[in-house]
Curated annotation (Swiss-Prot):
Protein name: DNA topoisomerase 2-alpha
Phosphothreonine: residues bearing it: T280, T1244, T1323, T1350
Covalent cross-link site, Glycyl lysine isopeptide (Lys-Gly) (interchain with G-Cter in SUMO2): 17, 154-155, 350, 384, 395, 414, 416, 423, 438, 464, 478, 527, 582, 597, 612, 620, 623, 630, 637, 653, 660, 674, 1073, 1193, 1201, 1237, 1272, 1279, 1282, 1359, 1363, 1369, 1381, 1418, 1438, 1450, 1455, 1480, 1488
Superkingdom assignment: Eukaryota
Cofactor list: Mg(2+); Mn(2+); Ca(2+)
UniProt cross-references to SUPFAM superfamilies, sorted A to Z: ATPase domain of HSP90 chaperone/DNA topoisomerase II/histidine kinase, Ribosomal protein S5 domain 2-like, Type II DNA topoisomerase
Length: 1526
């Protein structure tokens, strides 16, 4: 029989019954399908309405008399709890209807009667006209009645569905309502019995007192399977009474006649936290805020996951809901940010994990709340419908961050990190380890003899091979070998993620069997390790010392107890070996070798071999080392807390300032030793057997830290780092007349100057020295012949070193005269003479090309300055005048740079408004690269982001590799708004530059911090002047010797001709006697050189030729030398040769007399004049080279002009003047104060001095609280720039990069020559906060970026320029033509001033050119151009007048006048040229003045750059590449 789908399940069951049941009476359809009244349904299925009516056991918050509110396990019936709550909430709801209500009384009687009374407005005692019954009887005795059904009315009560009080009535054996209404002057009372099944008689009485309502009910406990109200349910009900007291404002709650001691929500929260403490035993901190009348929030820390106690309109939402999420999410979002900052690199923390540490108390009043059930434990209304908002204040958030939650999260993070780290360790000792490549495990490792095993950690695979060779002697049972891939991580400052992912560290832990957090104090714990010792085997150089230090730091940081067990030792190998016959001596430190040399006069007879690394040793030597293990194994010995302090000093991030003093004392100590002639301190003598950690740090590791500074921070004298100096040394030595490939030159540098690092970094150094685009070098020392990078990508677009060529710039030898080489102190490496300690240029190159580098303890940042201004200031100093202030300046930069405060500058790009919907950007801040700007600024503005809508509608690009031009379209409204805010701010065209870290090595090799650029200039001036004196002294000696030599030779020839001397057929000895008798001098030149005790470089190679015979024969050395006379050829006796010799003698004498009359200042001025003259020639050549590549060479002039005008600023644009606000200046001042404060703590390196001994001062210092000075790199607003910062290129190698930009010299729009100082008025608003603050902090590394951009000068003084420029007169005309800097190295001087010339068409007369000349552009003190004079008074030059005319026309110009900023280098001259070109073309409708301003003789001036950046692997030009290694 088939069943119909409607048949009930129980009938299906009947079908399966046996046949004998068929006879039984079947159930009728009526009994199967029933209809119940709603009252019956509620009683039959109570869980639908009030929740379960069965006993439930769970954890709940209750109130116990003896304990107070506590969280414990209770057994209760949810339905009973719910009906009580409904009445209680109704009483609280009355407060919303009647704000005057002030009291609720809850009474629980022994006979299970419960009474709840409130003095709010009574229920209307009036008959309902529709239902024909009194309202109290209607709402308490009839189902589905309520005052809450109008959803259009915004109610903030707990009632909603019309069930609440009726359900209490239905589940009570007796339910009495008593209410009095003053309004209706009646009192109503009625009782229902038998589950609302029977209503008693209604009582009505007249009433004139205060309103009140009292509900008394006796729960039908049989429905709840109970006999009486037990302790647990009463504890729950009492807690609800406390809830109401805490959540209902201004209402006194009485329980059984006693007032509850709760005075508001805050005191209610305290009841939960009574006796609760945090991990440290302190009472929990509570953060409280009454956000507004409808929201009140408290927050504290939770140790049991997320907890919340919340109320919505007095309903206890025990399961929370959207109101809790709404508040919690606000707090979590803020805390997550804080935790991420404090937990950089640790375990990733998610929002839910942060939430798990919070305990929120919330009391909310919400309009028409919705819940997921009648039990109302979870509020589901969306936040947008709350009817109010809860915006937590900053004060609350700040307090929340400090209340212990963040600390709790961080502790949890550490715990979690520890668990993850422990997974990397094995608690069990294994005999065999799998999965670690290159490990040669000791045979006994992990066995019972493991304590006797030693793990040898080597520096690289080659050192491992050496160790394995040595193991042939000592065997492999007790020795394992594992090669390190370089320097291991500094775990003290590493993030959790770094440690987790660092294979090297995890491998060491696995190999040795270490376990995190385990204390290896006793012998038993040591037996759990696979190896009893670690032996460190690295090269005996400074990088090898650093690896040793990092390993010591790794063990000390994680397992300090191991250091006390002599767990670490090192294996040392010789640095030098000397041998003679079969005798051999090994030295383990260079000072020891030098000491041996000084005590052994015959040391030259010994053969010397230098060992650069472990790879230099042969297998035979390795076996010798291991055979004499006692000599080569040095144990590290723990000597006490001073060892711990020393290790922390070297590696802790918090002890930056201590490290500074540590290094300063070391440098001072070393200087004192040199002055006193004492040998350097060294560690490894012939008898050294062990070493304390303190000695290792203070005598060996400090050498690495010091060399790190030497490699990263340039010298004040020549502005070069060692890598750059080696390149220059090699170039001088090669003296190439033809270009050479960069890759080949790098090989030559490595060979000639003992360069010990990677050739790739060397090639990058060479490229950086040759770069000349805007923002790189102002004066490139090498020529960029090929693609060396452009401003499009910041130099990263340079071609492969195999494809590009370079050679010395013609200016290099004028800057570093060869005459000075004899006064320099050359260094020796492996007994090979290499580069000098420093070169001594004729101008301070560190100011010309800037400097940037980060070493140990210090960082250096110096911007570029204008060559001519520097030359001019040196001339002023030579004349006894004070130098003029200088602003940073970058060659060919067309923006402006202004001073905000001392050593704080703002760099402005150029933007102009073309019409109501179009603007044009023609210059970006320094080191904001064109491509980067496009991707990071314009693209997001065009496409919008998740958070910001699009700002612009389109943009077009018209730039070349040297110029910038973006034409941007936007709506009128957006442009107007951007103008109001400030175009420079909106388009990120302002960056800041801070120069508060001008730290350089002085001439004695000590670090010195300079407060101002002029301090550097004065220091350089004093030293250079002294060296001109030394040069003169050397030249006088040399010329005197040469004059004497020629004099002797001439006399000898004359006397021979006259027959006074006969040399034919006479013994040599007799000849020598005759020469002595006749008063001839022994070779004067040779004698003078020997007196100098050194041979000049150029003659180093001639030793073997000229003087080989003399120097090799002992007789020659001991007696006088007359070979210079006797070796003269016979044809010197001819009349011509005799006359020539006499002429040479007279000329040399004249030269000597002339030199004697000159002062060192005269010599310097001569060098400066020659340099400036050549500078003009070089710049002229650059411009000429640029013009060669002009587009449309064979095209008509008009077409050519059209092409060029495309890349030049539009003549119709209205320049927007950058605005420097008071806020920006105030912020700059604040930063300076902050910086000064932190730097005072550090102390100036050079001055810290070393009064007490190094060690004592160090120990004192170690206790000092760590300083706060952290180094940040400045970053432009765009991400890419940050990369730039990495490299310190600015510091030396790249400083020269600016030539590319000058291709088209576009006059800055409406700019006037800089005249007076800082009062520049700017129309545009600047984003001081954004752009500035970030950038300044970068200070130490990136400040530079901004620096570069700033040609505009706010500082004054044109006067001086005149003097400096005199020599340049001729150059002006040349300049005009030579704007192009394509293949020629950028000329140093071009910076700002030189550029202007570019714009000059060939037509302009030389006069005009002079006026226009760089003089004007460059800024205050152009030094070498005749045009300078004019610069001082702008009116004099055509370009100036044109500018003025233009200015007068436009409103903005006037403002521009005040801001005498540094103008783009080509602005002045270019202005005049442009004007001409425009007026001639008559293409523009503008006034003449305007036309001139923008016109250029396109034909001559602008040549689109031939170079185009070539895509290739990015080159980090920013920092000196050598530094990358370290």
């Amino acid at each position: 029989m088939e069943l119909s789908p409607l048949q009930p399940v129980n009938e299906n069951m009947l079908l399966n019954k046996k046949k004998n049941e068929d006879g039984k009476k079947r159930l009728s359809v009526e009994r199967i399908y029933q209809k119940k009244t709603q009252l019956e349904h509620i009683l039959l299925r109570p869980d639908t309405y009030i929740g379960s009516v069965e006993l439930v056991t769970q954890q709940m918050w209750v109130y116990d008399e003896d304990v107070g509110i506590n969280y414990r396990e209770v057994t209760f019936v949810p339905g009973l709890y719910k009906i009580f709550d409904e009445i209680l909430v109704n009483a609280a709801d009355n407060k919303q209807r009647d704000p005057k209500m002030s009291c609720i009384r809850v009474t629980m009687m022994r006979n299970n009667l419960i009474s709840i009374w409130n003095n709010g407005k009574g229920i209307p005692v009036v008959e309902h006209k529709v239902e024909k019954m009194y309202v109290p009887a209607l709402i308490f005795g009839q189902l589905l009645t309520s005052s809450n059904y109008d959803d259009d009315e915004k109610k903030v009560t707990g009632g909603r569905n019309g069930y609440g009080a009726k359900l209490c009535n239905i589940f009570s054996t007796k339910f009495t309502v008593e209410t009095a209404s003053r309004e209706y002057k009646k009192m109503f009372k009625q009782t229902w019995m038998d589950n609302m099944g029977r209503a008693g008689d209604m009582e009505l009485k007249p009433f004139s007192g205060e309103d009140y309502t009292c509900i008394t009910f006796q729960p039908d406990l049989s429905k709840f399977k109970m006999q009486s109200l037990d302790k647990d349910i009463v504890a729950l009900m009492v807690r609800r009474a406390y809830d109401i007291a805490g959540s209902t404002k201004d209402v006194k709650v009485f329980l059984n006649g006693n007032r509850l001691p709760v005075k508001g929500f805050r005191s209610y929260v305290d009841m939960y936290l009574k006796d609760k403490v945090d991990e440290t035993g302190n009472a929990l901190k509570v953060v409280h805020e009454q956000v507004n009348p409808r929201w009140e929030v408290c927050l504290t820390m939770s140790e049991k996951g997320f907890q919340q106690i919340s109320f919505v309109n007095s309903i206890a939402t025990s399961k929370g809901g959207r109101h809790v999420d709404y508040v919690a999410d606000q707090i979590v979002s803020k805390l997550v940010d804080v935790v991420k900052k404090k937990n950089k690199g640790g375990v990733a923390v998610k929002a839910d994990q942060v939430k798990n540490h919070m305990w929120i108390f919330g009391n909310a009043v919400i309009e028409n709340p919705t819940f997921d059930s009648q039990t109302k434990e979870n509020m589901t209304l969306q936040a947008k419908s709350f009817g109010s908002t809860c915006q937590l204040s900053e004060k609350f958030i700040k307090a929340a961050i400090g209340c212990g939650i963040v600390e709790s999260i961080l502790n949890w993070v550490k715990f979690k990190a520890q668990i993850q780290l422990n997974k990397k360790c094995s608690a069990v000792k294994h005999n065999r380890i799998k999965g670690i490549p290159k490990l040669d495990d000791a045979n006994d490792a992990g066995s019972r003899n493991s304590a006797e095993c030693t793990l040898i950690l080597t520096e690289g695979d080659s050192a491992k091979t050496l160790a394995v060779s040595g193991l042939g002697v000592v065997g492999r049972d007790k020795y394992g070998v594992f090669p390190l891939r370089g320097k291991i991580l500094n775990v003290r400052e590493a993030s959790h993620k770094q440690i987790m992912e660092n294979a090297e560290i995890n491998n060491i832990i696995k190999i040795v069997g270490l376990q995190y957090k385990k204390n290896y104090e006793d012998e038993d714990s040591l037996k759990t390790l696979r190896y009893g010792k670690i032996m460190i085997m690295t090269d005996q150089d400074q990088d090898g010392s650093h690896i040793k230090g990092l390993l010591i730091n790794f063990i000390h940081h994680n397992w300090p107890s191991l250091l006390r067990h002599r767990f670490l030792e090192e294996f040392i190998t010789p640095i030098v070996k000397v041998s003679k016959n079969k005798q051999e001596i090994a030295f383990y430190s260079l000072p020891e070798f030098e000491e041996w040399k000084s005590t052994n006069p015959n040391h030259k007879k010994w053969k010397v071999k230098y060992y650069k690394g472990l790879g230099t040793s042969t297998s035979k030597e390795a076996k010798e080392y291991f055979a004499n293990m006692k000599r080569h194994r040095i144990q590290f010995k723990y000597s006490g807390p001073e060892d711990d302090a020393a290790i922390s000093l070297a590696f802790s991030k918090k002890q930056v300032d201590d490290r500074k003093e540590w290094l300063t004392n070391f440098m001072e100590d070393r200087r004192q030793r040199k002055l006193l002639g004492l040998p350097e301190d060294y560690l490894y003598g012939q008898t050294t057997m062990y070493l304390t950690y303190n000695d290792f740090i203070n005598k060996e590791l400090i050498l690495f830290s010091n060399s790190d500074n030497e490699r990263s921070i340039p010298s004040m004298v020549d502005g070069l780092k060692p890598g750059q100096r080696k390149v220059l040394f090699t170039c001088f030595k090669r003296n190439d007349k033809r270009e050479v490939k960069v890759a080949q030159l790098a090989g030559s540098v490595a060979e000639m100057s003992s360069y010990h690092h990677g050739e790739m970094s060397l090639m990058m150094t060479i490229i950086n020295l040759a770069q000349n685009f805007v923002g790189s070098n102002n004066l490139n020392l090498l020529q960029p012949i090929g693609q060396f990078g452009t401003r499009l990508h910041g130099g990263k677009d340079s071609a492969s070193p195999r494809y590009i060529f370079t050679m010395l710039s013609p200016l290099a030898r004028l800057l570093f005269p060869s005459k000075d080489d004899h006064t320099l102190r050359f260094l020796y490496d492996d007994n090979q003479r290499v580069e000098p300690e420093w070169y001594i240029p004729i101008i301070p190159m560190v100011l010309i090309n800037g400097a940037e580098g980060i070493g140990t303890g210090w960082s250096c940042k110096i911007p570029n300055f204008d060559v001519r201004e520097v030359v001019n200031n040196i001339r002023r100093l030579l004349d006894g005048e004070e130098p003029l202030p200088m602003l940073p300046s970058y060659k060919n930069y067309k923006g402006t740079i202004e001073e905000l405060a001392s050593n704080q500058y703002v760099i402005n790009g150029e933007v102009a408004i073309l019409n109501s919907t179009t603007i044009e950007i023609t210059e970006l801040p320094i080191r904001t690269w064109t491509q980067t700007y496009k991707e990071q600024v314009l693209e997001p503005m065009l496409n919008g982001t998740e958070k910001t809508p699009p700002l612009i509608t389109d943009y077009r690009e018209y730039h070349t590799d040297t110029t910038v031009k973006f034409v941007i379209k936007m709506t009128e409204e957006k442009l107007a708004e951007a103008e109001r805010v400030g175009l420079h701010k909106v388009f990120k065209l302002q960056t800041s530059l801070t120069c508060n870290s001008m730290v350089l090595f002085d001439h004695v090799g000590c670090l010195k911090k300079y407060d101002t650029v002029l301090d550097i200039l004065r220091d350089f001036f004093e030293l250079r002047l002294k060296y001109y004196g030394l040069r003169k002294e050397w030249l006088l000696g040399m010329l005197g010797a040469e004059s004497s030599k020629l004099n002797n030779q001439a006399r000898f020839i004359l006397e021979k001709i006259d027959g006074k001397i006969v040399i034919e057929n006479k013994p040599k000895k007799e000849l020598i006697k005759v020469l002595i008798q006749r008063g001839y001098d022994s070779d004067p030149v040779k004698a003078w050189k020997e007196a100098q005790q050194k041979v000049p470089e150029e003659e180093e190679n001639e030793e073997n030729e000229e003087s080989e015979s003399e120097s090799t024969s002992p007789a020659a050395e001991s007696g006088p030398t007359f070979n210079y006379l006797l070796d003269m050829p016979l044809w010197y006796l001819t009349k011509e040769k005799k006359d020539e010799l006499c002429k040479q003698r007279d000329e040399k004498e004249q030269e000597l007399n002339t030199l004697k009359k000159k002062t060192p200042s005269d010599l310097w001025k001569e060098d400066l004049a020659a340099f400036v003259e050549e500078l003009e020639v070089v710049e002229a050549k650059e411009k000429q080279d640029e013009q060669v590549g002009l587009p449309g060479k064979g095209v008509k002039a008009k077409g050519k002009k059209a092409q060029i005008s495309e890349v030049l600023p539009s003549p119709v644009g209205k320049r927007v003047i950058p605005q420097v606000t008071m806020e920006m200046r105030a912020e700059a001042e604040k930063k300076i104060r902050r910086k000064i404060k932190s730097e005072n703590v550090e102390g100036t390196p050079a001055e810290d001095g070393a009064e007490p001994g190094l060690r004592q001062r160090l120990e004192k210092r170690q206790k000092r609280e760590p300083g706060t000075r952290a180094k940040k790199q400045t970053t432009l607003p765009f991400k890419p720039i940050k990369k730039a910062q990495k490299q310190n290129p600015w510091s030396d190698s790249e400083s020269d990069m600016s030539s590319n930009e000058s291709n088209f010299d576009v006059p800055p729009r409406e700019k006037e020559p800089r005249i007076a100082a800082t009062k520049a008025k700017f129309t545009a608003d600047l984003d001081s906060d954004d752009d500035f603050s970030g950038l300044d902090e970068k200070d130490e590394d990136e400040d530079f970026f901004p620096l570069d951009d700033t040609p505009p000068k706010t500082k004054m003084p044109p006067k001086n320029t005149k003097k400096a420029l005199k020599p340049q007169k001729s150059s002006t005309s040349v300049d005009l033509e030579s704007d192009g800097k394509d293949s020629v190295p950028a000329s140093p001087g071009a910076s700002a001033a030189d550029v202007p010339a570019e714009t000059e068409p060939s037509k302009p007369s030389s006069k005009q050119t002079v006026g226009v000349k760089r003089t004007i552009t460059k800024g205050q003190s152009l030094t070498s151009t005749a045009g300078t004079k004019k610069r001082a008074v702008p009116k004099e030059t055509k370009s100036d007048s044109a500018l003025n005319a233009h200015v007068s026309k436009k409103p903005a110009p006037a403002k521009a006048k005040n801001s005498r900023k540094r103008m783009p280098s080509s602005s002045d001259s270019s202005d005049s040229e442009f004007e001409k070109a425009i007026s001639k073309g008559a293409t523009s409708k503008k006034l003449k003045g305007e036309e001139r301003d923008f016109h250029v003789d396109l034909d001559d001036t602008v040549a689109p750059r031939a170079k185009s950046g070539r895509a290739r692997k990015p080159i980090k030009y920013l920092e000196e590449s050598d530094d990358d290694l370290f």
